[in-house]
């Protein structure tokens, strides 16, 4: 699917929802956004905020032959370019920024989604068999199964046999959920309903892994399960969300090739509102073809 097709899908879905087509959003200060570049410099300041736009736009090459080329290169990518060297070693500011980004990525893996936040969104919260974050990181197999209490809650509080069941899970990035939720879930649910689909009760799974959607789909009898889950963070990019969609999942028979994945959903990648429109179109095609993953035809 090329960019033109994606834009057409977004326009079609947003028009059916009675909303204006979203305009390009100014990039956030995340690493995925294109920075406004500072001029090449020969000095370093340890007082500079390493998370600021100025620090991310810093050019550390001393006495460049073509400063304009470095500025354009730095503006065109979020990669670690134009950082310069001090002999064979990285410059102090470049190393500090690397360490700061690495710390930020570790923090978002270890953080918890606040229970107050889940309640504020009006979401039912259930858990996998995991009881804490340390166990979540060391026992991924337990994150693929719902706890007995969660199974009872789904059976008693959720709509059974929906066309589409939407699930939100923290995964490996708390920031991905809290930063993108408002811009992806409301338009996604509205788009699915506008398409005439029977949408199940959305809920939040704490400590969930991707494969947990198979058990959810089997319990609720959902035709399509859509899981919005936090991606493993990269250096400086902790807000990236993924969508894993699967048709008629079964714990015993569904394999990874049966899933369709849309990744890199954040303001510096695929905008959440645009992703919502693409997911609506994907769900419709899954129901039409009765397939997902590699079994779908283009």
Swiss-Prot record:
Keyword Lyase in record: yes
GO CC term (a single one): ethanolamine ammonia-lyase complex
Catalytic reactions of this protein: ethanolamine = acetaldehyde + NH4(+)
Subcellular locations according to the entry: Bacterial microcompartment
EC number: 4.3.1.7
Entry similarity comment: Belongs to the EutC family.
Protein name: Ethanolamine ammonia-lyase small subunit
Provenance organism: Salmonella paratyphi B (strain ATCC BAA-1250 / SPB7)
Lineage: Bacteria, Pseudomonadati, Pseudomonadota, Gammaproteobacteria, Enterobacterales
